Amino acid sequence: MLKGVENHSLPRTAAFFDLDKTVIAKSSTLTFSKSFYQGGLINRRAVLRTAYAQFVFLAGGADHDQMERMRAYLSALCRGWNVQQVKEIVAETLHDLIDPIIYDEAASLIEEHHTAGRDVVIVSTSGAEVVEPIGELLGADRVVATRMVVGDDGCFTGEVEYYAYGPTKAEAIRELAASEGYDLSRCYAYSDSATDVPMLESVGRPHAVNPDRALRREALARGWPILDFHRPVRLKQRIPGFSVPPRPALVAVAAIGAAAATAGLVWYANRRRANVA
């Protein structure tokens, strides 16, 4: 599937991975909804709505307009949430919640890319409080995600500084390539969503993973490889055992509140329910 070990006399390369339904089997942020409830960040009603949103997300996800509306909704809902508390909740529950839903196929690909000498970069609309710990768990070198403003009191102000979605993901990849010396024509990218077409077409070796219908059509039209990941498994249970080689500290290129992304999908669930009614 992959090219051999990198020729280090050539420019560096990287593999860019979307996170939800590409590396892990569920929405990373929605997976923490029960933990956020137990920590007092959301109420019981919101927990039920996030469960519904998880179902909707797995069934097909949100389109561009819905995701744009999520951005406005999440910023309002998360205003005043303590960032350190969110980080602590994620740290306490990360292995129990995320480890079991990592795709075995994705973990193998990450190993192969590292063995070949490529950097691994997680590129996600979800947040630093979720994505950075998952990146460390996987041995990723860098994380690109959305960024919300944090006030002097350590809480979200409700303002979105940077939204890692659609074309902005591709822009971040190009900026990272310029700063790190990646040759994008020889880089890889993986995603499940048609909203990530700009990211996929920014590299020379794009791959559709568990694609939604729109991305499947695009991949077939462009001749992009289509991969089927369907085996979530705990990393420590993989055979041979998954091992993360010693690597420099993960670099967060950008970040967002995990709770904020959860709130966005709560909004999406409400919208879908209203349409059905």
Swiss-Prot record:
Entry keywords, A to Z: Hydrolase, Magnesium, Metal-binding
Entry's Gene Ontology molecular function annotations: hydrolase activity; metal ion binding
Pfam (any one): HAD
UniProt entry tagged with the keyword Oxidoreductase: no
Domain of life according to the entry: Bacteria
Sequence positions that bind Mg(2+): 18, 20, 192
Family: Belongs to the HAD-like hydrolase superfamily. SerB family.
Protein name, entry field: Inhibition of morphological differentiation protein
Organism (species): Streptomyces azureus
Classification of source organism: Bacteria, Bacillati, Actinomycetota, Actinomycetes, Kitasatosporales
